[in-house]
Amino acid sequence: MTTPTQQLSDAGVSIWLDDLSRGRLQTGTLRKLIEEKNVVGVTTNPSIFHAAITSGTDYDATIAEQAAAGSTVEETVFEITTTDVADACDLFAPVAAATRGVDGRVSIEVDPRLAWDTAGTIAEAKHLYKKVNKDNVLIKIPATLEGLEAITATLAEGISVNVTLIFSLERYRAVINAFQSGLEQAKGNGHDLSKIHSVASFFVSRVDAEIDKRLDAIGTDEAKALKGKAGLANARLAYQVYEELFSTERWALLAEAGALPQRPLWASTGVKDPSYPDTLYVTELVAPGVVNTMPEKTLDATFDHGVVTGDTVTRGYDDANATLNALDALGISYNDVVALLESEGLDKFVASWKELLGDVEGALASARKAS
């Protein structure tokens, strides 16, 4: 019997795990997910690293070594995160080889405090890429206005990029433009375009979480009927943008030079509302050439009881437009929602990063006292 995760893979969906820790690497649980549940990549973010590093004792030895070496807290966090990502890259190397680098990818994010600093982001992206030193790493850069320039510049250096925290269709268009500009510059710089890979991480469940609150406040039957629909509608229309902008003459010239399209990646795919089906943002977002990065709980639910019925994206464009129009008619501002979500998303990552630095600083101090 074919498992639901295999069915997703057969439908053109690449399954990535939205989590990474040293424990997963050392105990073999990540390898098991590759072997049994069709996982072909990993994404990380500041919140994931904060949870990994501050729970358990997996990082105590490294922190003690860094303390003895006199490393700063930033140097220690950099060493820990890049080591885990490099080890994960090695684990996924056979997948990368089998897919010519399309999958087998491991993402690591630039310091989120640099989200509004173009030059700082470019420098950090290069630093991370050099330190990890693996062909299958993706450097995550947030899709802020300042980040767009950094995305282009990083790709122009031949570095593969995961563009993160995309919420709006307008910003997604700008992301694809930044990607194609980066490839055009990379070509001019003499890079092999077939070796430059990118995904655009479009966040899904957070859109519903915010819009559902506003629908509840309105409270009418018409409003309640729209709950749980905005996130899917937004993502489906993003795929329509993807189809449009990778069918242009501009893209055809890049493709002739060996370029591969920047794939849409569905992020934030765990349901926030427990009344919704736990596989909602997986089985309802099936389309050729997409990535779906899932927390393990969502992955397990999909493997256990996900119902895959083929492409559930391209046949839903009319309904998706109708959903967004209905929200607008109720006075819910799409632009207001997506701007708020970008701001909140960045704030959450910055807060997690600062908490991580504070916790590691305390651990370094304790290690120095113990020695």
Swiss-Prot record:
Please name the CDD domains in this protein's record: Transaldolase_like
Q: Which GO terms describe its molecular function?
A: transaldolase activity
Query: Which GO cellular component terms, listed alphabetically, does the Swiss-Prot or TrEMBL entry include?
Result: cytoplasm
Quote the catalytic activity from the record.
D-sedoheptulose 7-phosphate + D-glyceraldehyde 3-phosphate = D-erythrose 4-phosphate + beta-D-fructose 6-phosphate
Could you mention a single GO BP entry for this protein? pentose-phosphate shunt
* Subcellular location(s) per record: Cytoplasm
Instruction: Look up the record and name the pathway of this protein.
Output: Carbohydrate degradation; pentose phosphate pathway; D-glyceraldehyde 3-phosphate and beta-D-fructose 6-phosphate from D-ribose 5-phosphate and D-xylulose 5-phosphate (non-oxidative stage): step 2/3
Pfam families noted in UniProt: TAL_FSA
Superkingdom field: Bacteria
Q: Which residues form the active site?
A: K140 (schiff-base intermediate with substrate)
Q: Which PROSITE patterns match?
A: TRANSALDOLASE_1
| The enzyme's E.C. designation | 2.2.1.2
UniProtKB keywords:
Cytoplasm, Pentose shunt, Schiff base, Transferase
What SUPFAM superfamilies does the record tag this protein with?
Aldolase
UniProt family annotation:
Belongs to the transaldolase family. Type 2 subfamily.
Against PANTHER family, the record matches this protein to: TRANSALDOLASE
Q: What does this protein do?
A: Transaldolase is important for the balance of metabolites in the pentose-phosphate pathway.
Name of the protein: Transaldolase
Q: Which organism is this protein's natural source?
A: Arthrobacter sp. (strain FB24)
Which lineage? Bacteria, Bacillati, Actinomycetota, Actinomycetes, Micrococcales
The gene designation is tal
